């Protein structure tokens, strides 16, 4: 509640009760509540959610099958204990450095494929460096980041585009062994 009300201790409804106008600002936060338009778009998207999940799962299964024969570790999206919404397709390339992965990302870009990294450890970001965070205090975070590449995974990808990503990613990996 605090983040959505500029740090106020009461919401608007609580302040409308007779004699209950008094409130405090706990900290200088933000006003991040959802607008009516955003809510309407969200409700519309929720109707499509099963279709979105199905398409993402289809892409994930194609990627998983294609990458089985390569030295690629992938985030497990589906198991007996959990089911993912398939938001991201994270790969890890054991033995590769961040610099090597950055080169692979550039080579993918040259082929028209937008890849990413999820996520850069907070101690590498200026705001956190300025607060005194040091990367060496978070070795696991760096280890997860060091050789990670996120491949495209969205419902607008056609089957042909998924095949293209698979083809180019594996081709680039073979060249960079």
Spans of features found by a protein language model:
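PLP-dependent aminotransferase class I/II
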Residues: 1-177
